[in-house]
Amino acid sequence: MGNYKPSIKQYVVTVKAIKSSQFGRLGICAVVLLFVLGYPFYFISNNPFDTSIRYQYVDPYNDTTRKYTTIEKQHTDIGGNGTTILYPKNLQLDQTALSQLLNTTETTNPFVQYIGNSSSIAFSQLNQTLVNHSIQVFDPFSNSDNCSDLMTETQLTISQNIIIKESFEIMVKRLMHQLDTEPAFKELAPFFQNKLSLHLRMRSYHKHFYKFARTSVWLKDYGVHLMISRVIYSQKGKKGDPQISLLYTQLYDTNWQELTNTDLLVSMQDITGEYKLEKLQFPRFLPMPFYYNPKLTKGRWYGPEDARIMLVKNQLDMEEPVVIYNSYHRQIANHTTTGKTDGSVELNFEFYRSMFVGWPFRYQLGKSNTDGFVDDRFDNVKFTRVAELKIHNQTRASIEKNWTPFVDPSERDPEDKSLYIVYQWDKLRILKCDISNLVTDDGFIHYSACRFKQDTKHDEVEKVGPIRGGTELIPTIINNKQLWVGFLRAHIDKCGCGKAMYRPNMVVLQKTDMGTFQVAYLSSYISFNIPVPGWKTHEIQCGKRDPNVLIPNGISNWEVATIDGIERDVLTMTLSAADEDNILMDIHGLKTVIKNLITNQKHGNEFNSDSVQMKCVVAYSIEFCRAYGEEQARLGLTGGWLPSHN
């Protein structure tokens, strides 16, 4: 027989001979085959190998050369009733009255009234091992263009830095509880793709959650630090590709031990403006209102970013925390008629990243002020009260960020009605924002009107300089001068260590006799002797495409203690390294350092307005970056890349 090639007619005859039951069996086999071949791809796409199969948990706090804080884990019943209720020392209510007020029992929820002093300084802080740390500061009181004429080298007295130990397990469990039980969080569930339980089982949360930018305030009537952190979640486990950002709040005692499952009894301001006693459980995610669409996540980072917490005086003459942050939101740009007989219109939106102020101890209903219009899903949902910080009579910019907040205690009556913002440090521009009387342009959405208190802007459009953001500014008076002290951050690209370098810069802002502001002193880069891990791989420093990041987040407290009859001030600040490690560090005797700078000022009061001071700070910071990169290359820690700078 030769080669046999069946004709199409023969194929048709063969097919007709197959019984229907055989077709059924073939169909079942095809479905099974598709499942066997296709399911692994579906599983991998939803449960990547790097997080679900080959992921091996590594304790991020196992470096024996570093010092860590502790976590009090006596109570970790997330969502349970076994919490301790802490109430302030100035509240005159017995525990029976408190039980009736909160509809609870002393047995189930023990009440604890704080009876300690108002100081945040712990005994351990006064007995730390301290070292001197040299910094270079520059003043503007000279007509010279020579940086050495503006520069003074001085010493800071600093403590060993401490990494704040985290429990991601507690945090993820708290998030799951809030997603299940709190209306403000339920609509956020799609961002997490039903994988939170998987992250807990596999202990893979460190690959998807990143917690940094921690900043805190001392609540003196409760004897606790209230700390707020930014938590980002990446579905793909990439730090540079998060889909959502949330704010997580925690409580710490004076020794920086975290207090879990603790309630604070606080005076909450409701939507009518009245104050009522309510208990807030910690740790918890703040129910911040923000615009989001879980179906559209590419290139959109939803949620609050770069939050800074600080204390202001409210109308009850009590200290109250406020949070300054930036967030992606939308507003109605215009509307067009649809041409339908029902008179309906089509809304057109614009999207922005703007600055906001939030009050953690106040509520609002709904989130129309971040979404641009009323959504009936949220009409009766309680969120943290927020307001946009908007420059009055000026078109809203597409992006606003890196504002530096402070208050002026001399203007209190009795509350802080205004919030000051350093909008730009180079060619100083300062806003004054009204936070006591919000305004509206459309009778619908209210915002805080910000007006320039000081503006040296030139006619040409200028880019934001490399020195920006940083901590809030803390007021003080030294040598009868009204000053504000903080730590900015300089962001310098391609200076000799990878893609960019971020480091702290100490700043002293001064109010002149004329009522204007000037930068009295500004330092170049400060290392604080803090080890900075690589951005992607901890062991690789100054990677070609990676930033090298140490950012100051906030000043937790700055107080004076008396030791053997001698007064010594202690400033505690928080920093973030590589957007992962959260660090505490103390500076002792900073007021003395500033007093000596003022007393020994080399020049008169003639102010150089040509930004020579800023140029010198940047130049010396670039030199720091170059030397740092060369040292990492010498040590073989750059992953094969040789640092270079422009």
From Swiss-Prot:
Which keywords fit this entry according to its UniProt record? Answer: Cell wall biogenesis/degradation, Glycoprotein, Glycosyltransferase, Membrane, Signal-anchor, Transferase, Transmembrane, Transmembrane helix, Virulence
Its membrane topology is listed as:
Single-pass type II membrane protein
Query: Which InterPro entries does the record match to this protein?
Result: BMT1
Where it sits in the cell: the answer is: Membrane
Glycosylated residues?
N62, N81, N103, N117, N127, N132, N146, N334, N393
Q: Which residues cross the membrane?
A: 26-46
Q: Extracellular side: which ranges?
A: 47-646
Induction of the gene: Expression is induced in biofilm.
| GO molecular function list | mannosyltransferase activity
What highest taxon heads this organism's lineage?
Eukaryota
What are its GO biological-process terms? cell wall organization; glycosphingolipid biosynthetic process
Q: Where primarily located?
A: membrane
This entry's Enzyme Commission designation comes to 2.4.1.-
Null mutant phenotype:
Leads to the production of phospholipomannan with short truncated oligomannosidic chain and impairs induction of TNF-alpha production in macrophages.
Transmembrane helix keyword on record: yes
- Topological domain, Cytoplasmic: which ranges? 1-25
GO cellular-component terms in the record? Answer: membrane
Q: A Pfam family in this protein? A: BMT
Q: State its role.
A: Beta-mannosyltransferase involved in cell wall biosynthesis. Required for beta-1,2-mannose transfer on phospholipomannan. Required for pro-inflammatory response in macrophages through phospholipomannan-induced TNF-alpha production.
The record's comment on protein family reads: Belongs to the BMT family.
- Name assigned to this protein: Beta-mannosyltransferase 6
